[in-house]
Amino acid sequence: MKKTIFITGASSGIGKATSLFFVQQGWNVIATMRSPENEKELSGSPDILLLKADVNDTSSVLDAMTTGIARFGQIDVLLNNAGYGQQGIFEAVTLEKIRQQFEVNVFGLMETTRAILPHFRKRKTGTIINITSGAGRVTVPLVSIYAASKFAVEGFSEALSYELESQHIKVKIIEPGYISTPFYDRAKADYAFDPQLEDYSKFQLEMNDLFSSFGAMDTASPQDVAETIFEAATDDTHQLRYVIGPDLLPMINLRNSSSDQDYIDAMRGQFMPEAFGKSMQQKN
């Protein structure tokens, strides 16, 4: 029997690329999104079932899973991909925006995971793949809320992997670096700004200039991520984390090879070189 993957947030970027790649590899795909009626590229294959599901509406997720199982017989892999990135100085991000970030990136992911577990337990097999981010391992300024949500998913996923081992269910974490997708367009559109916080103006300009240069770096593509997701789904190992992106690997390697304080000092020197240099001189 052909295997089946259930994907959230399949309308663009990593979700869409993964849907197309898995079909090319001979899988069935249940591609879910909030507005499937607007999707054209994924609608032509008999092996792709387009369904409406919003991770913040558990009943819609359960309905999509039930419909998908009726169509394809079973679900073998859940890909929790739906999410977005709230950016901006922490003081400028309202509590409403913070809650919404966690509703989508954390609570929606958790409830989607909860929804699939009875099916996986009944079958005594299944793989849950959670898309986190480099920001869940090594974070930077202006993404404190997004990073907090991804750190939460990292901790949840690791702890869950230990729990579900007893049920023969695997948990995998995909950690992309910078990927050029509509994800970043939304992040820019949702950027939290408060003109009254003038004290941060110079810092924000410098950081935005720095982050704008990331697009010119050697980075991974949605296709690269899709291929790594396929590896995680099929490699039959207990590997938990899969890091993607030449921009991210050096930062993770630095964190792993340095003491905690040496790493923090290096990052502070990167983001606030003048102020950090003065503070280090005063210490010495």
Outline where the language-model segments fall.
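Substrate-binding pocket helix/loop in short-chain dehydrogenase/reductase
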Residues: 89-90, 97-99
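Active-site helix of classical SDR
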Residues: 113, 149
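Residue(s) in the substrate-gating loop at a strand-loop-helix junction
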Residues: 133
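A glycine-rich helix->loop->beta "capping" turn
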Residues: 67-80, 86
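The beta1-alpha1 cofactor-binding region of Rossmann-like NAD(H)/NADP(H)-dependent oxidoreductases
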Residues: 53-63, 95
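Conserved glycine-rich cofactor-binding loop
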Residues: 11-12
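C-terminal beta-strand-loop-alpha-helix "lid" module of Rossmann-like NAD(P)-dependent dehydrogenases
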Residues: 169-214
